């Protein structure tokens, strides 16, 4: 039997803006989770020093809010890049509109999750199931931002958070908005 060499070619999949988005997003999620835990359940730290020097909780909140803005505008940039990036970054790659994409979703489930097939699904970039899951994750990013800015709107008179003030009553109040915000944090941690 004669062995055949596979012809390989290099494909540039993950453009620099996508890589930057990914790592900025990862750093933001870590910072937001840590500061979010502290905001949700602040430790009781007693200090004999002047109050000016022990304004640590205000600093934690400030870091959380600034990072939230970075997270949101990084997400807005990724939305934009989904229209102008290469074919692997575009939205039509993430939204399975074609029959072939749905077929690949089922094939990946059979191979990687159910393990009833042995032949791996070859894909350049994300396979169709991963793309679909990332599309859902983008919606989770949006909902996380909406709930966060909606909760922040009550404490801020700034223009931008006020754009989201309508979301908290729509969700049934502060408690439900906070619960959704908290649940999505755990989704990102586990994802």
Spans of model-derived segments:
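Membrane-embedded alpha-helical bundles that constitute the cytochrome b-like, heme-associated redox core
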Residues: 1-191
